[in-house]
Amino acid sequence: MTARGNLFIVSAPSGAGKSSLISALLKDKPADMQVSVSHTTRAPRPGEVNGQHYHFVNVEEFKALIEQNAFFEWAEVFGNYYGTSRHVIEHTLTQGIDVFLDIDWQGAQQVKAVMPEAIGVFILPPSRDELERRLTGRGQDSQEVIASRMAQAVSEMSHYKEYDFIIVNDDFDTALADLRAIIRSQRLTGASQIHAQNDMLNDLLAG
C-alpha cells in the first residue's frame, strides 16, 4: 500500500536561501517529491518558464480562480498574487509523492487551517547583516527595494514559532542536510509506516 505523501510548507524571508535549498533538494528530479507550481500575477523573470516555475496569469484570471475556490491557499505579496492549486496538491499526495509549498507565513496559516498535518519548515538567515548582504549580492533590486525587503523580513521572521522545524541557513550544505533529515523523519513516523508497510505488518502479526 502506498503511503500518502507529506505536505511540507517551506517559508523564509527573501534572501534566506529557501528557493536554493528546494532547488538543490530536487536537483536530481526524485520521483517521490516535487515542488508545487504556484499561480502568480507577477511578471516572469529572465529564464522562468510558464508551467514550470509558475503558472503566470493576470489579475482578472487570478480573481476568477479565487471565486471558483480553486486555490488551496493564496496571498498577496509585494503587490502580486500567489496561489496554490487545490486539485493538484491533493492528487499528488494521494500518489505517495511529497509536495513542497514555497509560500510565506500568510499562506502557511491558510494551509494549516485546512490541513493541520502539513509540516512547516522555516528557513532563517544567520544574521540581519548576512541577509542584507545576500539581497544586495543578487544585483536584481534597487536599494529602495532591498530596504523594503529587509523591513518585511523582520515581520516575516516573527512568525517562526508557528512552524514545526527551524533551519538556520549559515552553511548551505548543512542546511540542505537538515532539510533532508526532516523529510526522512516524517517518512518514518508510525502513521506513514503503517500505510507503507501494511502488508508486511499484517504478515508479522498473523497468528
Swiss-Prot record:
Gene Ontology molecular functions: ATP binding; guanylate kinase activity
One Pfam family per UniProt: Guanylate_kin
Guanylate kinase-like domain location: 5-184
Keywords in alphabetical order: ATP-binding, Cytoplasm, Kinase, Nucleotide-binding, Transferase
CC terms in the record's Gene Ontology section: cytosol
SUPFAM superfamilies attached to this UniProt entry: P-loop containing nucleoside triphosphate hydrolases
Cell membrane keyword on record: no
Cross-referenced Gene3D superfamilies: Guanylate Kinase phosphate binding domain (3.30.63.10), P-loop containing nucleotide triphosphate hydrolases (3.40.50.300)
PROSITE patterns documented for this protein: GUANYLATE_KINASE_1, GUANYLATE_KINASE_2
Disulfide bonds: none
UniProt xrefs under SMART domains: GuKc (SM00072)
Domain of life: Bacteria
Chain's role: Essential for recycling GMP and indirectly, cGMP.
Protein name as annotated: Guanylate kinase
Lineage, broadest ranks: Bacteria, Pseudomonadati, Pseudomonadota, Gammaproteobacteria, Alteromonadales
